[in-house]
Amino acid sequence: MNTRGLLAIVFAVALSAAPQLVTTANAGGTYSARLISPRVGQVLYPGQHIRVEWKSVLPDLKGLAGCEMEVWLSVDGGRTFLMCISPSLNPKAKFFDWTVPNMPTNAAVLDIRFGCEVFYPETFAPQPASTFVIAQAPVT
């Protein structure tokens, strides 16, 4: 075996072992979130601009890289979350401004997600206790 091939194998083995060396236990703590706004039962209208706001408990971020938060929308009561409605957010963010889409539903639910690339797996925090309504667009 030539030196180049040996180096490639050693490099590949090192990369495959790296994620196991940094576990979520090393991250120190768990993630949770609670939606503040929109409130349970609140009626929103397509095109309306609102502030989505939450409180969260983050793990210790010391030594972690590539961390972000995202907020996803479900229009079927939280069974599926098919639409990311936020930009990639700093993990310490507590809100973002959102334009409500024209997706009428009586069962809108948000999922406030957190993760740190390979160091802390994407963690879901769906908010089914804070179901809200997206009304039909007014007819003009």
Pin down the residues of each PLM region.
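Positively charged n-region of N-terminal signal peptides that target proteins for export
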Residues: 1-5
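Bacterial N-terminal signal peptides
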Residues: 8-18
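Extended, solvent-exposed regions of the mature portions of secreted/cell-surface glycoproteins
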Residues: 21-140
